[in-house]
Amino acid sequence: MAGRTVTRADLCEAVYQQVGLSRTESAQLVEMVLKEIADCLARGETVKLSSFGSFVVREKGERVGRNPKTGEEVPIEPRRVMVFKPSSILKHRINGTVGDGLDED
């Protein structure tokens, strides 16, 4: 069952409620963190957030695909993709199980 979607505004409100910064400062903080993560990923760097997970940029090489309607072979250009690998702590939290408290990442 899918839960609700958490937006930037929700994150800003949570920072405002829990940290005690003003709403403007909370929004700026959230934006700065997201921008830094995006900038690191754009440079091809891995972003590891302890007890949460890692965002990794992977290179996919050129390959041959196939048009499903015609069966014609079509080249697929090389590209970079972003992958999120959750930490074992986050996996245990999502599944409601108790982990050993150690992060595999």
UniProtKB/Swiss-Prot annotation:
Belongs to the bacterial histone-like protein family. Keywords: DNA recombination, DNA-binding, Transcription, Transcription regulation, Translation regulation. Heterodimer of an alpha and a beta chain. This is Integration host factor subunit alpha. The keyword Transcription applies. HAMAP family: IHF_alpha. It holds the Pfam family Bac_DNA_binding. NCBIfam families: himA, PRK00285.1. InterPro entries: Hist_DNA-bd, Histone-like_DNA-bd_CS, IHF-like_DNA-bd_dom_sf, IHF_alpha. One of its GO terms (biological process) is regulation of DNA-templated transcription. The keyword DNA-binding applies. SUPFAM superfamilies: IHF-like DNA-binding proteins (SSF47729). The lineage of its organism: Bacteria, Pseudomonadati, Pseudomonadota, Alphaproteobacteria, Hyphomicrobiales. SMART domains: BHL. GO terms for molecular function: DNA binding; structural constituent of chromatin. This protein is one of the two subunits of integration host factor, a specific DNA-binding protein that functions in genetic recombination as well as in transcriptional and translational control. It comes from the Bacteria.
